[in-house]
UniProtKB/Swiss-Prot annotation:
Sequence positions bearing Phosphothreonine: T171
Topological domains annotated Cytoplasmic: 1-3, 88-98, 162-173
GO cellular component, as recorded: plasma membrane; vesicle
Glycosylation site positions: W43, W61, N62
Protein name in UniProt: Lens fiber membrane intrinsic protein
Record keyword Transmembrane present: yes
Gene3D superfamilies: 1.20.140.150
Mode of membrane association: Multi-pass membrane protein
PROSITE patterns in alphabetical order: PMP22_1 (PS01221), PMP22_2 (PS01222)
Keyword Amino-acid biosynthesis tagged: no
Family as reported in the entry's similarity comment: Belongs to the PMP-22/EMP/MP20 family.
GO biological process, one term: lens development in camera-type eye
Amino acid sequence: MYSFMGGGLFCAWVGTILLVVATATDHWMQYRLSGSFAHQGLWRYCLGNKCFLQTESIAYWNATRAFMILSALCATSGIIMGVLAFAQQSTFTRLSRPFSAGIMFFASTLFVLLALAIYTGVTVSFLGRRFGDWRFSWSYILGWVALLMTFFAGIFYMCAYRMHECRRLSTPR
């Protein structure tokens, strides 16, 4: 059980760090504009060496930002529950901390999937046609890696929960 929780905690830490870095950085998309390279993130866009805040309130950016922030919050609360699961006493039979941590990591996975799906759909259908020579960049890719890490953290914690439940049910009372 503890090895599953340890693996889940490792995946959760890495996934949460990647979520925060992906959300905060400006390299979701790179493109060429007026002969010079440019890149943009969820909060700023940069032309050459100058960066500007994205002040326009565009729905897909707002949705992507919100889902990325929700994902990071769920992953952080999952880490807290996951750490507390190591100290779980047998008196807490109603609320299983490994199960709760797993649910939080799956919620984080869902939110980051929604954020990346929205960003991908709008970028490919609208921005990709507008800029011509463009590509997704490393911040965007970190988001996909974070999705995998939070998903596997959820899997590990659900396996730990299942293993604990099987042991609890098999011991005589």
